[in-house]
Design a protein with these regions (language model features):
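Intrinsic-disorder/low-complexity, polar/charged segments enriched in Ser/Thr/Lys/Arg/Asp/Glu/Gln
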Residues: 3-7, 44, 54, 67, ...
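Short, highly charged C-terminal tails/helix-capping segments
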Residues: 128-144
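Glycine-rich portal/gate segments that line the openings of hydrophobic small-molecule binding cavities
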Residues: 28-29, 34-74
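Glycine-centered tight beta-turn/hairpin loop motif at sheet-sheet or coil-to-beta transitions
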Residues: 1, 50-52, 77-79
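Beta-strand/loop substructures that line and gate deep hydrophobic ligand-binding cavities in soluble
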Residues: 75-123, 137-139
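Hydrophobic pocket/interface hotspot
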Residues: 17-21, 27, 45, 59, ...
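Hydrophobic/aromatic beta-strand elements that line small-molecule binding cavities or substrate pockets
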Residues: 8, 56-61, 82-90
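Hydrophobic ligand-binding cavity/cleft-lining segments
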Residues: 1-36
């Protein structure tokens, strides 16, 4: 098994970071083309990345402003059963330490290596959105 882990600070409080990482509206600002679902334990999320990429995930951890996790239930075979999540910790008065993970990959294959890079890019876009209010159109995100 292989995992992707990123840890970084965002200059805003945990409630805003949690909203960006755990709600369909928040995810659409930095990761998905569109998302649907109820942000609650056991709910199903629909994650859309274009016509050939309509994926699904189940919320397996939901602790407001603290932690969130999705288990992929319909996705690329390498992503099936993997878990995407974050743990948040206040850092100072107006910052949040984010521990992001995408765990349970079958191996550190080519897709895993590409996804490591893509997650870093997407998380950077999320941080820019939260800290500066910048919104990057979906089609331009991997070039931002």
């Amino acid at each position: 098994m292989a995992d992707i882990i990123h840890e970084f600070t965002v200059r805003t409080g945990p409630p805003r970071v949690f909203h960006a990482m755990a709600t369909p509206q928040g995810l659409t600002h930095w990761w998905t083309q569109s998302s649907m679902g109820m942000p609650q334990q056991g709910a199903e999320y629909q994650l859309h990345f274009g016509p050939d990429y309509a994926w699904r995930a189940r919320v397996t951890r939901y602790e407001p402003d603290v932690a969130f996790e999705l288990e992929m239930t319909q996705a690329h075979p390498d992503w099936m059963g993997t878990r995407i999540g974050c743990e948040l910790e206040p850092e100072g008065r107006e910052s949040t330490r984010v521990r992001f993970y995408h765990s349970g990959w079958p191996s550190a294959n080519q897709h895993w290596r590409v996804s490591c890079y893509c997650w870093a890019m997407y998380l950077r876009i999320m941080r820019r959105y939260l800290e500066r209010g910048e919104s990057v159109p979906y089609e331009q995100r991997l070039d931002a």
